[in-house]
């Protein structure tokens, strides 16, 4: 599951490497990637247009997330088919979670001053994290 080079680097740090460690590392990498792409690198163009189905802004945002998901393959190994399936799945799920949140929020006219707005952000983030648990489960059973 771990590349030989990554395994040696981790073991030099005195960390005992096993499959549970690797899966937790992959999960931590996905969570970190999510914060970076959702809160630091997401542009106003992406944010404003995620609620319009098929808009390039939302597609770009989901595509960047999918590309960032490739980082887990630095510490794990899988077949090319599984890797492609994970990345495509991440793109599709991320896109539709974001679109649904934005679309519903727009239709309901939720803004930052309303509790429902903040709940929708919480549900959005929870669903994304569950997606990452799903990715790790795929890696664990592949």
Model-inferred region functions:
Residues 2-142:
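Hydrophobic alpha-helical transmembrane segments
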């Amino acid at each position: 599951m771990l590349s030989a080079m990554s395994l040696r680097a981790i073991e030099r740090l005195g960390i005992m490497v096993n499959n549970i460690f690797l899966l937790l590392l992959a999960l931590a990498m996905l969570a970190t990637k999510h914060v970076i792409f959702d809160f630091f690198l997401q542009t106003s163009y992406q944010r404003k247009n995620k609620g319009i189905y098929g808009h390039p802004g939302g597609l770009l945002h989901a595509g960047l997330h999918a590309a960032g998901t490739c980082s887990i393959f630095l510490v794990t190994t899988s077949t090319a088919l599984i890797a492609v399936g994970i990345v495509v799945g991440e793109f599709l799920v991320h896109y539709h979670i974001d679109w649904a949140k934005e679309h519903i929020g727009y239709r309901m006219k939720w803004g930052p001053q309303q509790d429902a707005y903040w709940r929708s952000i919480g549900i959005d983030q929870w669903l994304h994290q569950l997606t990452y648990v799903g990715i790790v489960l795929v890696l664990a059973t592949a």
